[in-house]
Amino acid sequence: FNHEFGLDYWSNRVNDWDDFPDVRGTINQSLAAEFCKFQRSLVTKFLSWQADIVREYKRDDQFITQNFDFDWTTHSIGYQSQVDQYDASRCMTVAGADIYHPSNEELTGAEITVCGNISRSLKKDNYLILETEAQGLTPWLPYPGQLRLQAYSHIANGSNSVMYWHWHSIHNAIESYWKGVLSH
C-alpha cells in the first residue's frame, strides 16, 4: 500500500489505520486520484441501483435516462469531474444532458458542440437535452432568433429534444430574474 501510493515519500508512510491521512487536500496525488475514482464509482453504483428499480416497473416502450451535467465555468463546458459519465451511462437506455450556454455576443457554439459530442458518445447514439436555458439574467438574454439558433444547434449535434428550464418565469426566491419560455 505504501509503495503503490508513494506514501514512503515525505514521511507519509502508513503503518496503522489510525495513521491514514485525510485525503481531502492531500499532497499525495496518487491517493487523491484513487479517492476521486472511488467517489465516481459510488455515483455509478447509485445510478445503476436507481435504473434497476425503474427497469423493474417500466413498460417495454419506456426508456431510462439521466440528466448528466457538465463542469461549469460561466456555462456548461467539458467533462463533469465528479462523475464518470461513460461508466454511469451504461445503465441508461438514452443519454440525457443538461447544457447551459451563454447568449448574445458571448455565444460561440463551442459549448453546444463540445457537450453535444460528449452526450452523443455516451451511448454512441442521439441523446436528449433534458435541461437548457430559455432566457436568463440580463447577461444571458438572447438576441431575437437566438433561442431558435441554439435549439437547431442542439438538434444538429444529435439531440432528439430541447427541454427548457423553465416553462414560465420564476416569481420568487433566488431565481426570480431567471426567465422562462413564457416571460410573464
Across the structure, where does each feature detected by a protein language model lie?
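Polysaccharide-binding and catalytic clefts of secreted carbohydrate-active enzymes
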Residues: F1-T113
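Hydrophobic targeting/anchoring helices
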Residues: D60, I64-H184
